[in-house]
Structure formats: structure tokens, C-alpha cells
Amino acid sequence: MKKRIFAAFAACALLLSGCAGGQTAEDTAQDTDAANGELRELTVVLDWYPNALHAFLYQAEQAGYFAEEGLTVNIQSPAGVNDAMSMVAAGKADIGLYYQQDVIQARVEQDVPVKSIAAVVQAPLNIVLSLKEKDITEPADLVGKTIGYAGTELSEALIHSIMKESGQDPSSVEMIDVGFDLMSSMVTGNVDATIGCLVNHEVPQMEKEGFEVNYFFPDDFGVPQYYEGIFLANDDMIENEPEVLAGFLRGCQKGFEDFKNDTDAVLQVLLDNQDESNFPLDPDVEKQSCQTLLPLMETADAAFLSQSEACWQENIDWMYEEGLISTKPDISEVMATIDF
């Protein structure tokens, strides 16, 4: 998976410093286009390269669902790990697909002016993953073991939390920063397990390569349930153009309905839009990923794109307890309600 980091948001600061107040020439041009009945262009920056999680977006654009809302959506892969947040914060993009805990920390520690407008995945995808031969199925099995991770504070906090919740000493686990090499560090025996792999990506990929694996979810062991992906927008857009955001979300909803009803056809739309030169997709892996994602993107208790104050508060409380944030923000500082 893409390396997640809680960064010092220097990129945000640099971009924001270049933004003057008031309406830009681009804004004026867009207002004129809207008045003339032309489509309003939106730029959406993904969290990672195009994959099964994003299939509904490509379907919504291709099927004309965004056009029905007066929108044309330019879907971009990120050039840097923080682009989905930093570009949106600076007004260089309209909407980003990013991560719940990162938004909370960015708001608290750097006052980055973004909020979540919708939850794309209603449950975590992040797992503790190991080869089956290691016989690791719960936190207690990690005692005396090595865990590979991407050097992030979040991964450290997740392991600390699940070990503590299970009555184990967190220091009994050795955390090893393996950077991006999560899978290879496991299969070569450099570490016993990893945290940071995704159930919808690394699991089907490793299984296709012939590896038997075990995994468990941190939220089964004391970590609060959280949204693996959220759409975010900046404060100005939320205040001044909520109807544009609502139209975008309606288009996404229609794309997701197609994704549910004809998964193979929508997957083909994704494959037709893959970044083949940089990140070629394996159709078998992405098909299995779709089957994993669909019941997590919409559940019996939560509609697609819905988000709850309770989930945000539980994660704020947990992050504060784990020392990931210095103060607890109001929910209104990190989450916005867009009626669509």
C-alpha cells in the first residue's frame, strides 16, 4: 500500500502561502461558465494510484452522472503522498480522497483548513498481516515478534493500543521500519508480521502469488472503528459551494449503485483508466478487491458516503489518548455535513 505518514505539513504551508484572499481569475471564469450553462470543472486528487476503491468515480464520470449535476470531474493520481490534502487545502484541487486520522492531526497540529465531507469506506482496511506459518492470529501472538511498518506514528499507536488492550506489554514487540517494502519484508523473513497492508490489496496479491496468510484488524482489539477513506474539501468551498459538493456526492452515489449492481462492468471501466505505465493493475487482484470492498463501503448500519459524529469523536479521543494529537478538536472542525 502507499506509505501513510503523519507529516509536518510543509507542503500545505507552502501552497497556502501562495493563495491570496478573495476570488481568483479561475474562480471568475468558472462562475462565468456556470452562468452560461457550461460544466463546472472539479479536480479530485486520489489517495493512491487508481484501483478498485476508485472504480465508482470513473464509472460516475463515464456514465455522465457528474455531467447530470453540471460537473466534469478530472480525477488525478497524487504526485506526492500528501497531495490529496495539501492541494485541496491550498485551493489547487477541489476534493481529495484521504484518511480520517490524518485530517484530525492536520487540523489540530497545523490548522490545515480541510474537513471531511463523506466517508468512502465505512470500516478499516488496514490489517496486521503475516504468513500463515507464523501462526499469528491475535495480538498475544505478537509477543517477542518483529513487525514491519512504514515508519508512521499511526502504525506505532495501533500496535501499542492493541497490545495494551490484550493485556500484553507493548515493548515486547520490536517495530522495524521497512519503508514501502511491507510484503517483501514478510516473504523474505526479515519480519514476522506487518501493519499497514490492506485487506483488499496485499491479501489478494499475496494469495495469487501462492502465499497463505493470516491477518486481523486492529479495531477488533480496542482500536475504534474508523473510516479508511474520506472525501475532503477546504473550508472555503464547504462554505461557499455546498451545492457543488452535493452534486459531486450524488454522482458518486450513482456510480456506486452501478458498482454494486454490475461490478464486472464497472471494474472494466477502472481497468480502462488504469495508470498502466506506472501502476498496472492485475484484473484478478482487483476483482477480489471489489468483493472485499463492497460490503465495507456500505453496511447494514451505514449508507455509502455517510459519516457519524460518534465515529469522529471516538477517533479523536483515541488519538489524544495515544499522544497523536495535543488537543481534542470540536467535531465541527474536522467534519462537515453536506446534504445530498
Residue ranges: model-predicted function:
Residues 101-102, 181-184, 190-276:
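Pocket-lining segment of extracytoplasmic ligand-binding domains
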Residues 74, 82, 220, 284-291, ...:
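Short linear loop/turn motifs
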Residues 310-340:
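Conserved C-terminal helix/tail region of periplasmic/extracytoplasmic solute-binding proteins
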Residues 239-322:
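Secondary-structure end/capping motifs
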Residues 1-40, 340:
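Short, low-complexity disordered leader/linker segments with a strong preference
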Residues 30-177, 185-188, 192-200, 216:
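Short, glycine-/small- and polar/acidic-enriched structural segments
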